[in-house]
C-alpha cells in the first residue's frame, strides 16, 4: 500500500494521533534510531486527485504535525511525500539517516516561528511600467535598506530568546524564520511586542511550526 509520510522524530516519546490525511490511521514505528510517522493511503488518486482534495489533505497533514509538535520536535517530510511501501520508506530513511539523526538531536526541543514583512506602498507600484536603470538601482537599494532595518530590529529585540535566524526574499515580501528553544516561546512573543512599528512595513507572525527551515546546518544552508 502507498504510504504518505509525515515526519521523523526522536525515538521517544511516541505520540498517538487519532486521524491523519484522508481520515486514515497514523502509524509510527521506531527504526534506525528514529521514529517515523506515516499513513497508508489505499487510493491516492481519490485522496489527492484534485485541488480541493489536496487542500483538505494538507490541512490534515499540518494538524498531525501540530499534535506531534505539542509533545516533541518533528522533522517534516515535504507534503505530499508518497512512497510505494514500507520497504521504500526504509530505503529513504537509510539513504538520509545521518542528516535525520543529526537534525533530531540538533533541533530537539525547538520551535520555528515565521515573520513575513510587506511594504504596502511598494506593492501598489506598477510592475509593468518601464523604469530607467538608475531608477531601478535606486528602488533596489531602498528595498535592501528596508529589509536590513527590519532584520536588525528583529534580531536586536529577540537576541535573548532566538537561537538562530534565517531569511529569504520573496516577491514583494521578505520572510524570516526564527528557531528558538521551546521554553523561550513566551519570551520571544513578548520581545516582539516591545519592537514597535517598523516604518512603512507590515509584519505578520505565524507559528509555532516544526523547525523545517533549519534541518540543514547553516554551513550547508548558506
Task: List each model region and its residues.
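An interfacial alpha-helical scaffold signature
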Residues: 1-222
